[in-house]
Amino acid sequence: MAQIKSYDTFQNVKDHIQKGRILSKGATLTIASGAITVTDSFHLVATEGAADTDDLTTINGGTQAGQILVLMAADDGDTVVVKNNSDPGSTLEIGAHFSLDTEDDSITLMWTGTKWIALSTHSNS
C-alpha cells in the first residue's frame, strides 16, 4: 500500500483518503435490501425504513486490497446486525454475526480484494 510522502500533492493525499488509507467520515448509509455501498473509510449505518433491527449482509464499494473500513450505528435506538457470510452474495467474512446496537459500538473491516474481513469489534452494550 502506498504511503503519504512529504512531497505528495493535495490530490495525492485526497486519493489516500478516498481509498481508505486514512479514515475519512462519509455520509450516513441506510441499509437497502441488506446492503450498503461505502464511499469513504468511516460510515454510520442506519436501518432500512427506520426499523428497530436490520441485517447488513453485503458491503459494496471495496476498491483496493488493504482498504480499512469502520462502521458504527447511526441511531442508539436501532440495531444493525452485521451478518457473517450469510448468503451466496455476501461480501462479509467476519467469524460471527456482530450487532451494532449503541452509537458507541463499532466494527473495523479490511477489504481483501474479494471480501471484507473483521479486524476488530467493539461493543459498549
Go through each PLM region and give its residues.
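Residue-level "contact hotspot" at macromolecular interaction interfaces
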Residues: 62, 99-100
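Extracellular disulfide-bonded cysteine-rich modules/repeats
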Residues: 102-113
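Extracellular beta-sheet repeat scaffolds used for adhesion and glycan interaction
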Residues: 86-96
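Exposed extracellular interaction/assembly regions and N-terminal maturation sites
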Residues: 2-88, 112-125
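Residue-level detector of beta-strand structural context in well-folded domains
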Residues: 34, 96-98, 107
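Sparse, context-dependent recognition of short Cys/His-centered cofactor- or disulfide-binding micro-motifs
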Residues: 54, 92-94, 101
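Glycine-rich loops and low-complexity Gly/Arg-rich segments
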Residues: 69-71, 94-98
